[in-house]
């Protein structure tokens, strides 16, 4: 049965199989959906705004922050401040007091190759030479591989480098498990991220627990660190319990007033209320709008029950033969808050990572964004150059 489902696997390496669903997630769109839901519930959300200080003396009473777009500084008053800054948790804690670091940063990379070069039909789990698990996952026209686990000794950054040694580790692992040999030149997309792990003496990054921890600092800042994306709802509940304790101690509000009616486990996020299964929804969408089935499947998986609204904004491809539709660009700006070219092609649509033909998308998408956001020709050219340089940096190992 394994051989029938995954004929490219080495039979001697894969005698058994299980179904594993944890990785059926688009992390960027999951974050966006949570932000949109928060706004709908009354939250104020600000992007490109970095915190650089705390208000108050003995107790944190808010933050000072600077807008990365205008340079303007603002103050935000708050009864409780939460530090949920991921790899920047320790740097943010330094705003509260001179404290010892509690994090170890682990760098993980992914690489994507054409699905024709590594044909898999399901999530395939492999074991690397050091015993670490490596996954191969099909996504549209590509199969992507990940991840690695390497201690990151430099300060946290939004764009960690994709190192040659990590790429070689992933490609070698594939060769050990498939009758396929991949080279770096076959990689069409690559990216790296940082895991903020709670430090434990004498443990390597792969040995460190992924469990989250919540604690309160000397000025009352609630900090959360560690954890995994799949456990974010429970992490949020843990943070809110700590916030509730802080508020109750201040005699500002009681718990029933603060969190009445909020149940994270039963909440449906925007786009999540699909009545039928995804395959049927995609088939219906393709028939109703004369779309190729692969495009319809991608749209339904990306936008869920909001797919019809996206198509209404434009169902023509952004370039001849492209799978990305013009309505997706409008949606990215008007609904998902995109401001720059990389916002759209990296975080909102994932095209930079998961579309081997992304090169033909860059200029037409930039031109469409220029019309939506009022860019000058110079600003448009700058956005194109920035994205192309980032792509070149990510693929330096080729």
Predicted features and spans:
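Flavin-dependent oxidoreductases
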Residues: 56-59, 67-137
């Amino acid at each position: 049965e394994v051989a029938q489902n995954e004929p490219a696997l080495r039979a001697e390496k894969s005698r058994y199989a299980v179904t594993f669903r944890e990785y059926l997630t688009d992390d960027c769109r999951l974050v966006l959906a949570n932000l949109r839901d928060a706004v709908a519930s009354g939250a104020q959300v600000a992007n490109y705004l970095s915190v650089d200080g705390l208000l108050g003396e003995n107790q944190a009473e808010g933050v000072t922050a600077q807008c990365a777009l205008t340079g303007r500084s603002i103050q935000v008053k708050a009864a409780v401040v939460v530090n949920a800054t991921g790899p920047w948790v320790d740097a943010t804690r330094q705003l509260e007091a001179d404290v010892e670091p509690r994090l170890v940063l682990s760098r993980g990379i992914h690489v994507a190759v054409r699905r024709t070069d590594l044909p898999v039909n399901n999530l395939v789990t492999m074991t690397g030479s050091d015993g670490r698990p490596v996954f191969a996952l099909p996504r549209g026209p590509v199969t992507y591989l990940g991840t690695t686990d390497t201690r990151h000794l430099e300060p946290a950054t939004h764009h960690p480098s994709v190192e040659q040694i990590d790429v070689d580790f992933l490609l070698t692992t594939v060769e050990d498990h498939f009758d396929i040999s991949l080279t770096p030149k076959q990689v069409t997309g690559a990216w790296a991220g940082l895991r903020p792990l709670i430090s434990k003496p004498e443990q390597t990054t792969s040995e460190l627990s992924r469990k989250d921890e919540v604690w309160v600092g000397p000025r009352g800042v609630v900090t959360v660190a560690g954890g995994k994306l799949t456990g974010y709802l429970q992490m949020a509940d843990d943070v809110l319990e700590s916030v509730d304790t802080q508020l109750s101690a201040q005699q500002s509000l009681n718990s029933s007033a603060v969190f009445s009616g909020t149940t994270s486990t039963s909440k449906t996020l925007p786009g999540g209320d699909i009545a039928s299964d995804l395959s049927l929804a995609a088939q219906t969408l393709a028939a109703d709008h004369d779309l190729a089935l692969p495009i319809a499947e991608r749209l339904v998986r990306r936008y869920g029950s909001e797919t019809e609204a996206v198509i209404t904004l434009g169902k023509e491809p952004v370039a001849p033969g492209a799978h990305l539709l013009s309505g997706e660009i409008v949606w990215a700006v008007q609904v998902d808050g995109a401001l720059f070219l990389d916002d759209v092609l990296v975080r909102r649509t994932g095209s930079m990572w998961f579309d081997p033909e992304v090169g033909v998308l860059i200029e037409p998408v930039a031109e469409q964004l220029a019309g939506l956001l009022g860019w000058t020709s110079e600003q448009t050219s700058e956005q194109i150059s920035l994205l192309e340089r980032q792509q070149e940096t990510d693929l330096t190992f080729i």
